[in-house]
Amino acid sequence: MTTETNPAVTPAYNPSEKQKGAAKTIRIPIKVIPMERLPKPDWIRVKAASPSTRFYEIKDILRANNLVTVCEEASCPNIGECFGKGTATFMIMGDKCTRRCPFCDVGHGRPDPLDVNEPENLAKTIAALRLNYVVITSVDRDDLRDGGAGHFAECIRRVRELSPNTRIEILVPDFRGRMDRALEILNAAPPDVMNHNLETAPRLYKEARPGSDYEYSLNLLKRFKAQHPNTPTKSGIMVGLGETDEEVLQVMRDMRAHDVDMLTIGQYLMPSGDHLPVRRYVHPDTFKMYEEEAYKMGFAHAAVGAMVRSSYHADQQAHGVTSAQSDVVNK
């Protein structure tokens, strides 16, 4: 449940501190009211980390190189499985986001200055881990004139120098008000896959994505694709925030109308009681319906299921798309 926030009762805060939970969501236009939690169904299962996997090795390497992963910051339920397999989604430009999306567990606050050594540290870490496929994402950096596009480009360049055979997917923010500049910068160092998530249906944007615009995000994906027609584009949404099945299908249609190639749909799981509540748990049969409809609409790949997240098995998704593209070229 949500209501309008009353600014008169909002306490003071230190903007330089990282705010999470209630401290983060208290200043958004919509106030999150705690609700009784829906019981988790049997099909919601998370794989725990095992000491016999690379889970702790990956964590130690990340800390040693002063790197952050969205897996940790966003409390991803798949962290045990992904770290255990030696994969991670790197989050650049710090751990303080300039937005306050109440579904997300990444902290909000005044961001620190960019770490000029981060591209080098990131590239060295990826090379040391001998990763074949990496996903690089970031917090929103509305404080930067290019929205952080230049830092993305520098990270891509350094990774390519040290690991020329590593494929790079970037999961970018919307570069609000800076799209032209951001796309121009990325043209000089394009990724292998361009990902930007719509997150939810447009009706829920005021509640779930304050500060973002549905059409603007769609346009970002379409414009990148127009400039890089051979580079796969990708987007994802969560279900369980109050959307209807028809709204999910319409978002999928909108993606295809804006030339998005790859799709992810997963179940929203609230990180804490201070975040937006789960309003429904989508049945596996419904996820199957989404997947079938996705391929009918022409998506080259659709990763759809309760535990799917934007970067989950991203290497397998991209491999399927590029293999299909190669088949078309060779025919």
UniProtKB/Swiss-Prot annotation:
Source organism = Janthinobacterium sp. (strain Marseille) (Minibacterium massiliensis)
Keywords, A to Z? 4Fe-4S, Cytoplasm, Iron, Iron-sulfur, Metal-binding, S-adenosyl-L-methionine, Transferase
Please name the pathway: Protein modification; protein lipoylation via endogenous pathway; protein N(6)-(lipoyl)lysine from octanoyl-[acyl-carrier-protein]: step 2/2
PANTHER family named among the record's database cross-references? LIPOYL SYNTHASE, LIPOYL SYNTHASE, MITOCHONDRIAL
Pfam families the record matches: Radical_SAM
Q: Which residues are [4Fe-4S] cluster 1-binding? A: C71, C76, C82, S311
Where would you find this protein in the cell? Cytoplasm
Q: Which gene encodes it?
A: lipA
Cofactor binding note from Swiss-Prot or TrEMBL: Binds 2 [4Fe-4S] clusters per subunit. One cluster is coordinated with 3 cysteines and an exchangeable S-adenosyl-L-methionine.
Annotated EC: 2.8.1.8
Q: What is this protein called?
A: Lipoyl synthase
Known catalysed reaction(s)? [[Fe-S] cluster scaffold protein carrying a second [4Fe-4S](2+) cluster] + N(6)-octanoyl-L-lysyl-[protein] + 2 oxidized [2Fe-2S]-[ferredoxin] + 2 S-adenosyl-L-methionine + 4 H(+) = [[Fe-S] cluster scaffold protein] + N(6)-[(R)-dihydrolipoyl]-L-lysyl-[protein] + 4 Fe(3+) + 2 hydrogen sulfide + 2 5'-deoxyadenosine + 2 L-methionine + 2 reduced [2Fe-2S]-[ferredoxin]
InterPro entries listed in its UniProt record: Aldolase_TIM, Elp3/MiaA/NifB-like_rSAM, Lipoyl_synth, rSAM
Annotated ranges, domain Radical SAM core: 82-300
Q: Which GO terms describe its cellular component?
A: cytoplasm
Q: Which domain of life is it from?
A: Bacteria
Its family?
Belongs to the radical SAM superfamily. Lipoyl synthase family.
> Per the record's keyword annotation, is Iron-sulfur included, yes or no?
yes
